[in-house]
């Protein structure tokens, strides 16, 4: 496990929550160090070339998040480490054009006590597509698009934000990413 400290370098703290005690903002004050270890990781991968122009690969990653120290002992609230399952395929359509696609499933060991409004995770799946266009013998244009959909995580509370009332938070998000690059080999 690699240990690291994240230090806030806040010039002005203008964040104010109505009715919030000063202690609610203590983690974000200038100079506060937040421990967050990098977990150990196991990775297994295999690839196969079906034809000289058609390749596929599969991977599995395990992150031992439950053993990595986090601020406030947050890792204790995980039920297990993170599992990632990946697969992809690449096809050289011509000597100038390569197409690819792949997917990833991520499964965290989440619990209600792990999730908060300032830091949450959600299980997800990702689909991606890409193309490589060889412009010259040394230069290539790469483009790609990926879409990650996260499972909603519902957290119910009998004392929502210390109001004495019951309430529900639904943690969710979606990522859509486009990328383009020109690669040059020297």
Q: Which residues does each PLM region occupy?
A:
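Outer-membrane beta-barrel porins/channels
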Residues: 3-186
């Amino acid at each position: 496990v690699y240990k690291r400290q994240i230090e806030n370098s806040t010039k002005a703290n203008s964040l104010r929550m109505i009715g919030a005690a000063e202690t609610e903002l203590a983690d974000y004050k200038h100079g506060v160090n937040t421990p967050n270890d990098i977990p150990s990781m196991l990775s297994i991968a295999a690839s196969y070339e079906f034809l000289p122009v058609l390749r596929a690969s599969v991977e599995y990653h395990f992150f031992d998040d439950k053993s990595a120290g986090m601020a406030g002992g947050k890792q204790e609230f995980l039920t297990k480490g993170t599992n990632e399952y990946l697969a992809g395929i690449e096809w050289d359509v011509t000597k100038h054009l390569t197409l690819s696609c792949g997917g990833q499933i991520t499964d965290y060991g989440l619990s209600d006590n792990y999730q908060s409004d300032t830091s949450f995770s959600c299980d997800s799946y990702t689909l991606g597509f890409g193309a490589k266009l060889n412009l010259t013998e040394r230069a290539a244009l790469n483009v790609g698009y990926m879409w990650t959909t996260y499972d909603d995580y519902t957290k119910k509370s009998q004392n929502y934000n210390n109001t004495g009332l019951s309430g529900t938070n639904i943690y969710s998000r979606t990522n859509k990413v486009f990328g383009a690059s020109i690669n040059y080999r020297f």
